[in-house]
C-alpha cells in the first residue's frame, strides 16, 4: 500500500502523537494478515499434527472478532474435537503476542475459544475451525496458532482423509471488526495429499477375450486405502500356471505415473 509522507500526515492531522515507526510497520503488512502451515505434503490416512499460524495484518482484530480455517465439506477427514486433549483429533488455538514498538500498548485480549462446526461457513468450504476472541483486541503482527491434532497432551494427532488429492486447500477467513462479515486471507494454504507405501497389487483386464487373442492385463500398486501409488517404479515378477504348470513369466517395472 502507498505510504503517506510524514509531512503530509502532519499537514492533514495537525499535532498528533503516535509510537514512532508504527505507521511504517503496519503499512508494510498485508491488511488482513497472512497464514502459514508446517506441512506441504502428507500421506492419505496418516496421523498428523498440522499447525496453522495466522499473523494478523494491519487491520488487527477487535474485541469479539473471529478467525476461521475452513475445508471443503466432502472429505472423510476425521472430525475434530475440543473437549479431550489426550484423545485423537483434538484441536487447539492459542495467542502469541508480537513485540511492541516503544510507546505502543499491548493487546488486551484475555482468551481465545476454539470450536469445530461441520457447516460453519459457506459452500464449498463448509467445515470450519472457528476461533472466537474475548474481552479485548489483538494488535497487528500478533499470532493465532491453530493445531489440528494437537499432540502435546498425548494424543495421536488427526487422521487425514483417506483419499489422495492434489492441492487440498485450507481457506482462512477473518472478521476483523466483530461484525460477522468475513474476508478471505490470501493466499489459501495448499497441501498435497499423497498415497502411502504399496500394500497390495491389483489386476485389471477384460472378462471376455476371443480364442487366440492376447489378453491385456494391467497391474497397479495400491496403498492400504486403495489409492494408486505413483512415483514408485517398483520391480514386479509375474507368473501364471495352468494345471500346476507355468504358462507365463515376466519381470516388469511399474510406471512412475
Predicted regions and their residues:
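Ser/Thr/Pro/Gly-rich, low-complexity intrinsically disordered stalk/linker tracts of secreted
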Residues: 1-206, 210, 216, 224-226
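Alpha-helix capping and helix-loop boundary segments enriched in small/acidic/polar residues
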Residues: 207-210, 253-257
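Short beta-strand and strand-turn-strand segments in soluble, beta-rich domains
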Residues: 32, 122-131, 241-256
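Short flexible loop/turn segments that cap and initiate beta-strands
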Residues: 61-65, 163-169, 221-252
Amino acid at each position: 500500500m502507498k505510504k503517506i509522507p510524514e509531512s503530509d500526515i502532519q499537514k492533514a492531522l495537525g499535532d498528533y502523537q503516535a509510537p514512532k515507526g508504527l505507521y511504517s510497520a503496519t503499512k508494510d503488512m498485508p491488511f488482513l494478515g497472512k497464514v502459514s502451515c508446517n506441512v506441504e505434503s502428507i500421506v492419505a490416512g496418516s496421523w498428523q499434527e498440522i499447525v496453522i499460524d495466522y499473523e494478523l495484518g494491519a487491520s488487527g482484530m477487535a474485541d469479539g472478532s473471529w478467525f476461521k480455517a475452513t475445508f471443503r465439506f466432502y472429505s472423510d477427514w476425521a472430525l475434530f474435537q475440543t473437549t479431550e486433549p489426550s484423545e485423537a483429533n483434538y484441536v487447539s488455538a492459542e495467542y502469541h503476542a508480537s513485540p511492541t514498538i516503544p510507546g505502543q500498548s499491548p493487546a488486551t485480549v484475555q482468551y481465545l475459544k476454539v470450536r469445530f462446526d461441520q457447516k460453519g461457513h459457506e459452500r464449498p468450504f463448509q467445515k470450519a475451525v472457528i476461533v472466537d476472541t474475548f474481552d479485548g483486541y489483538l494488535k497487528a503482527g500478533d499470532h493465532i496458532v491453530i493445531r489440528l491434532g494437537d499432540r502435546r497432551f498425548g494424543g495421536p494427532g488427526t487422521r487425514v482423509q483417506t483419499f489422495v488429492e492434489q492441492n487440498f486447500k485450507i481457506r482462512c477467513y477473518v472478521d476483523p471488526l466483530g461484525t460477522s462479515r468475513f474476508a478471505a486471507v490470501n493466499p489459501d494454504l495448499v497441501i498435497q495429499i499423497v498415497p502411502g507405501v504399496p500394500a497390495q497389487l491389483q489386476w485389471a483386464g477384460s472378462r471376455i477375450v476371443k480364442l487366440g487373442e492376447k489378453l491385456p492385463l494391467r497391474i497397479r500398486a495400491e496403498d492400504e486405502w486403495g489409492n494408486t501409488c505413483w512415483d514408485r517404479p517398483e520391480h514386479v515378477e509375474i507368473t501364471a500356471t495352468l494345471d500346476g504348470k507355468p504358462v507365463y513369466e515376466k519381470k516388469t517395472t511399474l510406471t512412475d505415473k
